[in-house]
């Protein structure tokens, strides 16, 4: 059984027991939250698509921790002009465990 869930403008394919990195949610570690924005649900080769969400479907998650990803560096150099730009970016994320998918 798996589900497609919407969180922070992105879509994630999740199964029970998975550990997923969502965008920062500002929640306490060990807290449990229910997500109601389930776009699709598949169990026993039976696919249920929502319009836009599946009615009555919930996903229970447990927050593990909040962290920051490794730095992604972008570097641009223009040849023969002594011009260059270097920027770094670190994404904030929340690591969660999928406890239960209920339909």
Curated annotation (Swiss-Prot):
Record InterPro entries: bL21-like, bL21-like_sf, Ribosomal_bL21, Ribosomal_bL21_CS
Gene Ontology molecular function: rRNA binding; structural constituent of ribosome
Record GO cellular component, one term: cytoplasm
GO biological process, any: translation
One Pfam family, short name: Ribosomal_L21p
Organism superkingdom: Bacteria
Keywords: Ribonucleoprotein, Ribosomal protein, RNA-binding, rRNA-binding
SUPFAM superfamilies recorded: L21p-like (SSF141091)
Role description: This protein binds to 23S rRNA in the presence of protein L20.
Family label: Belongs to the bacterial ribosomal protein bL21 family.
Assembly behavior: Part of the 50S ribosomal subunit. Contacts protein L20.
Name by which UniProt lists this protein: Large ribosomal subunit protein bL21
Species this protein is from: Wolinella succinogenes (strain ATCC 29543 / DSM 1740 / CCUG 13145 / JCM 31913 / LMG 7466 / NCTC 11488 / FDC 602W) (Vibrio succinogenes)
Taxonomic path: Bacteria, Pseudomonadati, Campylobacterota, Epsilonproteobacteria, Campylobacterales
């Amino acid at each position: 059984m798996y589900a497609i869930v919407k969180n922070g403008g992105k879509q994630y394919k999740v199964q029970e027991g998975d550990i997923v990195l969502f965008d920062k949610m500002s929640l306490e570690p060990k807290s449990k939250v229910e997500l109601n924005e389930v776009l699709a649900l598949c169990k026993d080769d039976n696919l249920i698509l929502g319009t836009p969400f599946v009615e009555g479907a919930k996903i229970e998650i447990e927050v593990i921790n909040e962290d920051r990803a490794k730095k992604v560096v972008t570097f641009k150099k223009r040849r023969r002009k002594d011009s260059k730009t270097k920027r770094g970016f670190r994404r904030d994320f929340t690591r969660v465990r999928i406890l239960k998918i209920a339909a």
